[in-house]
Design a protein with these regions (language model features):
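Extended active-site neighborhood of metal-dependent phosphoesterases/phosphodiesterases
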Residues: 11-106, 129-148, 156-204, 210
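Binuclear metal-dependent phosphoesterase catalytic core
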Residues: 164-257, 297-304
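Active-site glycine-centered loops adjacent to acidic/histidine catalytic or metal-binding residues
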Residues: 4-5, 33-34, 117, 151-153
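Short acidic, glycine-rich surface-loop motifs adjacent to enzyme active sites
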Residues: 3-4, 103-125
Length: 304
């Protein structure tokens, strides 16, 4: 599943993208991103998706695979007021209508995987309730057995399972936001600006059981975090950047040689490796280091 921004504003390279995905030798499901739109047309947004539709098909479609109903949907809304890249997130009225009609044919005991470019539910920094038609599309998904909301767009990795204190009208929801597979924007080297390495999520669906792990390019699946010693974190903490950390994990412990050393606590931090990488970059059009929520830390009372 490709979560959007496949061409980065270059409408003529759709054939190149198709050639490269064909080499992967597997079925590819595409989602349209803001950089896949024709941003030059000022007439109406439907014309902005014309090139995408010519090469990759509809911007909204669905498929049943096993016990899961997959939805691929366009949630990038351009205002078309001027030639600037001005858009918001959410669903047009006609898109909500399509979603409701699509779900009429899906049994309520199905698992739903809804894939969009921008996160439709739990975001890291903004209120998704401001998304156009948020209440309507939330209600449409409310009664299904479980909903997984997949997205890209925000250039960080972020997983969140709904909790009562952050009520988004759906309590059977996990949101997964995926960073760029190629690394930080316009840099395309090793790391993203939250410290997540180049890579992608591998999702295993066994009936109704859904699990996943992050697969870093050039590594095996056991490489799931980077641990930084106190010398890299200011001298007081051991800190771990865990790419696929989820709030539903509960307590995370630090063990060495079969002995529990300490309890890890959630901590927003800059990734030390990306900070070092960014310091060497002369083209500062890439992303600056960002505070990432997937970090955990534990204090120390001995020399490391």
């Amino acid at each position: 599943i490709e979560l959007g921004d496949v061409i980065y504003n270059e409408l003529t390279v759709y054939p190149v993208y198709l050639h490269n995905t064909d080499r992967v030798n597997m079925v590819t499901f595409n989602v349209i991103g803001n950089h896949d739109h024709d941003q030059t047309t000022l007439l109406k947004d439907s014309l902005g998706t014309m090139h995408y539709e010519m090469h990759l098909g509809p911007t909204c479609y669905s498929a049943n695979i096993g016990r899961v109903h997959y939805i691929f949907i366009d949630d990038i809304l351009y205002d078309r007021k001027d030639a600037k890249e001005s858009y918001r997130h959410g669903l047009y009225d006609e898109t909500v209508h399509w979603l409701i009609e699509d779900l009429k044919y899906v049994p309520k005991d199905k698992i739903i995987m809804i894939c969009a470019h921008a996160q439709m539910f739990n975001k890291k920094t903004t209120m998704v309730r401001r998304n156009k038609n948020f209440a309507a599309y939330s209600k449409a998904l409310l009664d299904f057995k479980y909903v997984y909301s997949w997205a890209g767009h925000n250039h960080h990795t972020y997983l969140y399972t709904s909790e009562p204190e952050r009520n988004y009208d759906i309590d059977n929801l996990t949101s997964i936001t995926v960073t760029k597979s190629t690394g930080a924007l316009r840099l395309n080297r090793l790391l993203n600006n939250d410290g997540t390495p180049q890579g992608y999520f591998v999702v295993d669906v066994d009936g109704e059981e859904v699990s996943w792990y992050y697969l870093c390019c050039g590594k095996d699946r056991n490489y799931q975090m980077k641990v930084y010693p106190p010398a890299r974190t200011g001298g007081e903490y051991v800190m771990a950047n865990i790419w696929a950390h989820d709030n539903k994990w509960g307590a995370v412990e630090w063990w060495e040689n079969g002995v529990k050393v300490g309890q890890m606590e959630a901590h927003d931090a800059l990734d030390p490796d990306y900070v070092d990488l960014y310091a060497t970059v002369t083209n500062k059009t890439t992303r600056i280091p960002m505070l990432a929520e997937e970090f955990l830390r534990a204090g120390i009372d001995f020399d490391f």
